[in-house]
Every structure is written in C-alpha cells, then in structure tokens.
Amino acid sequence: MSIRIVPKEQLGAQREKSTTAETIPPLLFANLKSLYSRRAERLRKLATDNPLGDYLNFAAQLAEAQHHALHDNPLTLDLTEELQQGAASGKPPLDLSVFPRSEHWHKLLVSLIAELRPQAPEHILAVLDNLEKASSHELELLADALLNQDFGKIGSEKAPFIWAALSLYWAQMAGLIPGKARAEYGEHRQFCPVCGSIPVSSVVHIGTVSGLRYLHCNLCESEWHVVRIKCSNCEQTRDLNYWSLDSELAAVKAESCGDCGTYLKILYQEKDPQVEAVADDLATLVLDAKMEDEGFARSSINPFLFPGS
C-alpha cells in the first residue's frame, strides 16, 4: 500500500471506513517557516571536524538562501483541480513528470543567486553568472533534465542551484495542500504521494508520531509513513540489515535490502533529536562508501549531491 491525496469533500465517506492503521498520520507536510534555517544550522554544526566540512558549509549557505528566497517570494495557487485529478487517477497532485511549471521557480532562482553572491567564491560566482544569463527556455531544459534524472544533460555544478529553486517551488505548492486534502492508502509507497519524487532519507520520529518512520521527499520536503522492518524500495521484509559507522546506538544507520540490493539511510531522533533528513544524510557519505563496498546501490538522491557530482 501507499498514500493517496484526496479532496476535502471526500473525507466524510472515508472516515466511516477508517481503521486502526489509519489513525497513524500517513503524511506530514514541512514547516517551511523553520525548515531551511534549521537545515542550515545543522549543516554548519556537522561541518565541524568533518572531512567534507567545506561542502557542508556551502550547503548551509544554500539552505539559508532558500530560507530568505521563500520569504521574499510568496506563492498563491488554487490546487483544487490538481487534487481532483490526482484523486481520480491515483497519481500525486503535484506529479513532477506532468505538472505544468510556472516561471515562479525562475524568480526563486534569481533570489537564490542574489542571496549567494556576497559570500560566493570565484568558481561559484561563475556558475551563478551562467545561470543568471540563461534564457527561460534553457532553464526549463535544465529543470526537465533534473526532474527526469537525466543528469548527463546538466552539469553537476549547476544541479544544486536548479534543484534548490525547484524544491522551493514544490515545497510552496505542497504547503497549500493541507487545508484541502488528506491522505489515504493506495500503491507505490516508495514514491512521494505529493509530487512523485524519491526520498533523500528516512526519519524515525519522536513526539506525537514517536517511533514511526517517515520517508523525507527530496523535492517537496513532505514526509510519508512507511512501516519499519520493511524495505522502503521494494517492500520486502526477508533480508533487511542495518549498518552504522560508530555503534548500534548510532543516530544514522543504513537499512539495506538483500532482495532489491538497495539501501536507504534511517535517522533516529531518539538517539539525536537534532538529526535532519538532508543534512545528516550529506554528512555521512563515509557510510555511503561502506554500503557501496558491500555491493548495495543507493535508492535515494540528496539535493546537494547528484549522481556524477
């Protein structure tokens, strides 16, 4: 099973059919007021004594720029039609493969560039200049390449900036959904029920959803529930193993599946309440190297590190 978003008017009929399993919140939308500033803070903390410290600090600057760009470029959008179509077809309402993008994300990119310029070193400035000079058509081609995972068509130096703007755009749209929709169970649980993208990592929460695992979308920043002890990629339960660099009590582990040969990191807030889906994944690339040595392929993509980067 997976999660499907339905229009608000369908809630009454669904409540009559509710089960115990459905009392678990199937979908969590991001708190955009603090998401990017918290991510930037976490990245800076993790950069200390980390071999990838310089890149983590760069990622922190980009996350901070996202925080400001979000504030400076509010979005108003009626998603009623998209919700109705998604509910009828069983597809995500903000399906990245077919959703008609507006040029709002171009404005977000311009804001990101303006925020990053004052601190950017020369090699980053050259990339920002190139992106700023790109036509709308060229930007859309770059976006298509990233969203379709055709990474050979976009330079690895441009990818994080394009994705940062696209992610902001999708996160803003996702933030408009909660008052109009809820989630129910369906199929294709390995994909985000909001936009159809893939996770960056998974988080076992504390608080009101304590002990529950949620996959964190690498595009729209939403999180969706997937039960533990089940592969998030193929849903098998037979051959799961958990790997860590430090000890069994590590806050970041890799969950590997012998059936499909993939792995996804799992972050435990009970071990460290400050873990963050994107930051802690990026800061533990040594664990990725270990998993590759063991013959497992990563089933996720970090928005700061695309294949070929």
Curated annotation (Swiss-Prot):
- Summarize the protein's role: Necessary for formate dehydrogenase activity.
Per the similarity annotation, which family is this? Belongs to the FdhE family.
GO terms (molecular function) for this protein are: ferric iron binding
CDD domains, alphabetized: FdhE (cd16341)
By its UniProt entry, which Gene3D superfamilies does this protein fall under?
Answer: FdhE-like domain (3.90.1670.10)
A GO BP term, please? protein maturation
**Gene Ontology CC:** cytosol
From which domain of life does this come? Bacteria
Intracellular or extracellular location(s): Cytoplasm
Q: What SUPFAM superfamilies does the annotation carry?
A: FdhE-like
Chief location of this protein?
A: cytoplasm
- Would you tell me the protein name for this molecule? Protein FdhE homolog
- Classification via Pfam families: FdhE_C, FdhE_central, FdhE_N
Key words, A-Z: Cytoplasm
Does Cytoplasm appear among the keywords?
A: yes
Query: What HAMAP family would the database entry show?
Result: FdeH (MF_00611)
